[in-house]
Amino acid sequence: MKQLQTALFISVIVASISAHAANPSNVFVGAWVVQDVVGYSDTSGGPPEAKRLLGKTMRIARDSIDFDGQRCQPSDGFTISTVDTAPKLLDYYQIRVTDAGLPQKTVLLDSASCAPIFRMDARRIVFGWDGVILRAIKQ
């Protein structure tokens, strides 16, 4: 009986660890340093604004995003979903997947009030800020 209890306990622990690792919200949480500029719109600050943002750190927590001295904390929380990248990228930033270097399907961190963030891969994200589209790497 004791062996069965031990086996059951271990199974529950392994299952909970696996479920926690598979939680997509964890892929965004952390510090991300802006490495390069994907593009910018006519309404942005142009190259000077883009250069100013290089090297800045975005901090993503479970319930907030901090970047460039501003905090965004959506009252309704974040939505995390796997999306077809092309239509979402065009809708949010008016750029093509090939310009951003994103995969055809990706994970999107979204909310009603914060900048949408696309997961490029395990260590890179793409997001827009004041009309500048940026790529950042996990610190």
Predicted regions and their residues:
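Positively charged n-region of N-terminal signal peptides that target proteins for export
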Residues: M1-Q5
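Bacterial N-terminal signal peptides
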Residues: A7-S16
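Sec/Tat signal peptide C-region and signal peptidase I cleavage site
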Residues: I17-A21
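Tryptophan-anchored aromatic micro-motifs
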Residues: P24-T43
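Short, hydrophobic/aromatic-rich segments at coil-to-beta transitions
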Residues: G30, G101-L108, A122-I125
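Short hydrophobic/aromatic-rich beta-strand segments that constitute the beta-sheet cores
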Residues: V34, I65-D68, I125-G128
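Contiguous, well-ordered beta-strand patches that form the walls/edges
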Residues: V38-Y40, I60-A115
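Short, exposed beta-strand-loop hairpins at the edges of beta-sheets
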Residues: C114-I137
